[in-house]
Amino acid sequence: LAVPEQLFHYPLLILDPAENGEFKVGSNGTGAFTLVENEVGRRQVLKAHKPGYWGGGPNLDQLEFIDLGDDPAAAVSALASRQVDGLYGADIVQLDALQKIPHVQMYQVPTAYTATARVQPVKPFDDKRVRQAMRYAIDANTILQIAHRGLGQVGEHHHVSAVHPEYAKLAPFTRDVARAKRLLAEAGHPGGIDVEIACRPQPGWELLAVQAMVEQWKEAGIRVKINVMPSTQYWEVWTKVPFGFTTWAHRPLGVMSLALAYRSGGPWNESRYSNPEFDRLLTQAEGTLDVNSRREIMARLETILQDDGPIVQPVWRAIFTFQDKRVLGFKVHPSLYISGHQLAVQS
């Protein structure tokens, strides 16, 4: 079912066998451009195939991607001064400044891009009542407004988005602090719990979301210390920390996200979640072509994760970015793919 989508997805870069698995300057490919310069951490330059590209175009002679670093203000300044024609992606902390630039246009699209506060099966998280309490203690809509200015959709703690074709709409999952406190007491924590969450400082919306959740958890007796780690350091330990806030990119099918993140023993199963009934239903869903039949199975999978799962999921992001109004043919893709062969720049 997911094979065509997997072939199109960003982790599956298909290389020419003659190049021994190395992607480098001059590598052979099927795209409209060839990589001619590659300075890691600085820039890439791609030169157009003219003529003869099978997909139409390209209209530009070359594309240049520039790494402006982690400072959000640097990208805003570069776009405002027309040092660059557009941004690959924009962060919520840049939004106000970018909207004030008169010569740029905003593009956005709803996606299955998210981040989850996930736990591993160590105390106190090994008791599902604690995990349930963490979910009931938050108001996802408030966090969406604080962390992402309402650009997106509320999360429902099951990692299946309304943009997925097999999404099953469950009853709204609403905040209930009294229930969260009761669940903690039943789990042996009448005075609450003290834990630490690891997260990244960038993109800024992730830290904003964590800070908002921490304030809400506090009301239920869930006291959380925030350990902000540089992104490079976080990705070294993202599958090891007991409690972390991890970003997950858009996947076009819900079964793809669930298989990557929650199937027992999976290499990206950072929470180490293992539920035989969940695995059985997921395998069944992956083999069900009819979307309505698959949606019925997905409803059961979503319910399992809301009840037993290892995540608190506050938001689904809308992806947005800004381009100079001179840029023609640009469309924002949920996976942030850039169709360079469709682009042009008005002289």
Residue ranges and their predicted role:
Residues 40, 164, 181, 185-250, ...:
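Ligand/substrate-recognition segments at binding pockets and active sites
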Residues 21, 51-97, 214, 223-225:
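Ligand-site clamp/hinge motif
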Residues 2-64, 177-178, 182, 346:
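Gly/Pro-rich hinge or "lid" segments in bacterial periplasmic/extracellular proteins
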Residues 94-97, 122-163, 208-209, 305-310:
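Periplasmic-binding protein-like
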